[in-house]
């Protein structure tokens, strides 16, 4: 836990930087696990929705202490960023005009962070013609056609992103022409109870979030949905949250949760604070 706490206070730069810190502290210095084990955990977590670096750290905790240590690892990992962002959000809420004045230069910096993150993700993930085609399609639909689609088919909703993701996933599945490496099957006891619980909560949260006007219920549904459908790290989460919290008006509300300026302040601050980018949820 001490090592995780130390890493949490020096974890700038996103998942790849976090992985380098894990390698240095947990593998090379403490020798808790090997480089091969670390990369296996990270590769597996890359295929799962949610924050890959956080899930990797939780997997290491689970290896040594089961569910309890995995949960405590998560708590220690996100606590510093959570506390700092929560205090900042309270400060902005209490001193609205003055706080926004102090943070007026954070917004353009935050836009720069988002652009750089987008360029890095394109360089890392788009490597062939099909990839460029899918990236272009996603950009056109979510950025250029958002308002025309809103007029025609009511597509200006948070569900635009999962629809694009599912479409791209199906295209990639049917277009795959590579070879699958042989593997030695192993017998495991699959935790069906956990999977069923996860699906039931997802469905109930979606239904309650649609019919309820309670902001806490709606916020829970939003964050649970984000964690379920986000692949690729915290930077992918930012445009989804921007659409949900600044453009979408929830049931019983007269305006969005926050303004674009307030959200960009949060984006800039989370980049300046150690820890996972997903902790921006505490700011919102």
Regions found by a protein language model. Give the residues of each.
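Multi-pass membrane proteins that catalyze or facilitate reactions on polyprenyl-/lipid-phosphate substrates
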Residues: 1-48, 59-284
């Amino acid at each position: 836990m001490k090592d995780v706490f130390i890493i949490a206070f020096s974890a700038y730069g996103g998942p790849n930087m976090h992985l380098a810190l894990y390698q240095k502290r947990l593998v090379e210095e403490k020798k808790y696990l090997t480089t091969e084990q670390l990369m296996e955990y990270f590769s597996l977590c890359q295929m799962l929705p949610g924050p890959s670096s956080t899930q990797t750290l939780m997997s290491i905790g689970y290896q040594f202490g089961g569910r309890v240590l995995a949960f405590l690892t998560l708590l220690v990992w996100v606590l510093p960023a959570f506390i700092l962002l929560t205090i900042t959000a309270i400060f902005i809420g209490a001193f609205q005009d003055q706080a926004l004045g102090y943070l007026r230069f954070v917004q353009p910096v935050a836009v720069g962070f988002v652009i750089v993150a987008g360029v890095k993700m394109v360089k890392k993930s788009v490597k062939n013609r099909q990839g460029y085609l899918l990236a272009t399609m996603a950009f056109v639909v979510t950025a250029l056609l958002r308002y025309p689609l809103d007029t025609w088919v009511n597509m200006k909703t948070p569900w635009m992103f999962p629809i694009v993701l599912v479409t791209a996933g199906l295209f990639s599945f049917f277009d795959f022409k590579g070879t699958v490496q042989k593997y030695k099957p192993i017998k495991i006891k699959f935790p069906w109870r956990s999977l069923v619980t996860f699906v039931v909560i997802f469905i109930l949260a979606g239904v309650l979030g649609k019919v309820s006007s309670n902001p806490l219920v709606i916020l829970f549904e939003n964050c649970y949905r984000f964690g379920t459908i986000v692949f690729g790290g915290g930077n992918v989460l930012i445009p989804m949250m921007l659409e949900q919290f600044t453009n979408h008006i929830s049931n019983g509300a007269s305006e969005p949760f926050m303004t674009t300026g307030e959200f960009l302040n949060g984006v800039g601050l989370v980049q300046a604070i150690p820890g996972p980018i997903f902790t921006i949820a505490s700011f919102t």
